[in-house]
Structures are given as C-alpha cells and as structure tokens.
Amino acid sequence: MATTMASCGIGSRCAFAGAQLSSVKPQNNQLLGVGGAHGEARLTMRKATGRKSVAASIDSPWYGPDRVMYLGPFSGEPPSYLTGEFPGDYGWDTAGLSADPETFAKNRELEVIHSRWAMLGALGCVFPELLARNGVKFGEAVWFKAGAQIFSEGGLDYLGSPQLIHAQSILAIWACQVILMGAIEGYRVAGGPLGEVTDPIYPGGNFDPLGLADDPDAFADVKVKEIKNGRLAMFSMFGFFVQAIVTGKGPIENLADHLADPVNNNAWAYATNFVPGK
C-alpha cells in the first residue's frame, strides 16, 4: 500500500504523522479500525490518497492470505496478525515481534529505513574496490580504512579535489552530515512542508522523482523487491563487518582470495584460526 498507516492512542501523538490527533475528519482520513488491548482504545488511520489497497488492486503472490510463505508448503498457519497486507510478510514471526500493532508499525519503518541504508552502504563498500582493481586510483579503496585518511598528513581530498577544503576537517564533515541528514529526516518524519501528512516510509513527492509510485500495482511489486534486497543487504553489511575484523580486508579482496584458494580461504578456516587482536 502506498498510503499512510499509523496506530495512535486517542489524544496521543501519532508516531507516523508527528502531530496531535484531536479530531477525525472523514473527508481527509479513512477510519480503518477501532480496537485495543487492556482497555485502551486504538485508532488505525490512513490518509485518503485515492489509491486502492494492495489486496484489492493486484493478484500478487506476495500479498494476501495465499502469498508465498517462508517455508513454502511446509510453513504451517501464519499468526493471525500477519495477514499479508504489507510487503515482505512471509508469515514468520516466532518471537511475536509483530503482535502489537504499534510495535509492528515502528519495526516496519525501522526495517525499511535500515534496508535502504544497507543497500547504499553495501554498494559503497564494493564499488570503490572494484574501480581500484580496474585501474582507477583511490587514496584508499577499502571501506573501513577510507575514513581514516582524513587523519593522514595530506588529509582527505573530497572527490579528488584539494579545493574542497571542508573535507579536511572532521568537524566540518560532522556538521554537514548533521544539518543535511537532519533536515531530510525531519522532512520525512514530520510529514513534509506545512505539516502535510505523508507516509514516512513511502513519502512520495520529491522523494519519488522517477514516479515509481504512480501505478499502485507496480509500486506494490517494487516495495517487495526493495524489502527483499534490503534484507539481503543488511546481512551483507554484517558479513562485511565480520570480514573487516577477522581478515582486515575488503569484501572484493576477500572474494578474490576465496576464489583463488577456497580450501584455505573460507569462513570455517578463518573461524577456527581466528585470534582476537592478532
């Protein structure tokens, strides 16, 4: 769905909209459900955007009660609260992390945002090494060593240009990161200009310059691809961190070493010989 989903306690702050819920106006929002636990009333709100729900708009193997499950035909019955409404729902929640609607909404947002960072991070870890191995000169192509160049005698030339002197100061870099990223995240979480209510996970507008959300059916499919690749990227980044600690090499060099000598360069061989600090 390309609509805003939020679970809010009456008179409380909505975690997604970031604004006080003082009244419900049918012309602006649709009331999807009223429920609660332990005597607490809970409203589920969605901004009316004119887009149909995923289940109603497409016959997709990734959504609905007949969607693909985590173990295929051997998966068994999914929990009642996993209905296949959202992308990436394979009916698996042994820890019950999605049982509470508010916790589920928060975890959905965290997963998607971290997935996007992981996809960008994985690309940033791999691409410089690939370029360096193909003749492109870098001061330091290995991802976990590159940042330390700012403390070297010559400093760090951003984009290879010594004219960009702000890159020579770690404080200036930190300030730029806080201001720029803070502004973007604030825009996303607060709901855009003038407090307009938007979905913080899929805000659209200027965040969708290619118009990927214009077609609801195609957008539903893109969201599944995003979360699947994002989960893979998060596992990849975890692997890159472990490689950096154990081998002291980047992912491309580790891959090349493994392909050259798979018997001696593999996870089992390193795990059995690894001594912290050496």
Curated annotation (Swiss-Prot):
Residues the entry annotates as binding chlorophyll a 6: H258, A267
Residues where N2-acetylarginine is found: R46
Modifications after synthesis and translation: Photoregulated by reversible phosphorylation of its threonine residues.
Range annotated as the organelle transit peptide: 1-45
Residues holding chlorophyll b 1: Y70
Binding annotation for chlorophyll b 4: Q177, R188
Taxonomic superkingdom: Eukaryota
Binding site for chlorophyll b 5: Q177, F274
Binding site for chlorophyll a 2: H114
Binding site for chlorophyll a 3: Q149, L159, E226
Bilayer disposition of the protein: Multi-pass membrane protein
Binding site for chlorophyll a 4: N229
InterPro entries per UniProt: Chloro_AB-bd_pln (IPR001344), Chloroa_b-bind (IPR022796)
GO cellular component: chloroplast thylakoid membrane; photosystem I; photosystem II
Cofactor note: Binds at least 14 chlorophylls (8 Chl-a and 6 Chl-b) and carotenoids such as lutein and neoxanthin.
UniProt entry keywords in alphabetical sequence: Acetylation, Chlorophyll, Chloroplast, Chromophore, Magnesium, Membrane, Metal-binding, Phosphoprotein, Photosynthesis, Photosystem I, Photosystem II, Plastid, Thylakoid, Transit peptide, Transmembrane, Transmembrane helix
Metal-binding among keywords: yes
Gene Ontology BP terms: photosynthesis, light harvesting
Binding-site residues for chlorophyll b 2, renumbered to this chain: R116, I165, L194
One Gene Ontology MF term: chlorophyll binding
Cellular compartments annotated: Plastid, Chloroplast thylakoid membrane
Role summary: The light-harvesting complex (LHC) functions as a light receptor, it captures and delivers excitation energy to photosystems with which it is closely associated.
Assembly and binders: The LHC complex consists of chlorophyll a-b binding proteins.
Domain characteristics, as noted in the entry: The N-terminus of the protein extends into the stroma where it is involved with adhesion of granal membranes and post-translational modifications; both are believed to mediate the distribution of excitation energy between photosystems I and II.
Name of the protein this chain belongs to: Chlorophyll a-b binding protein 1A, chloroplastic
Highest classification ranks of the organism: Eukaryota, Viridiplantae, Streptophyta, Embryophyta, Tracheophyta
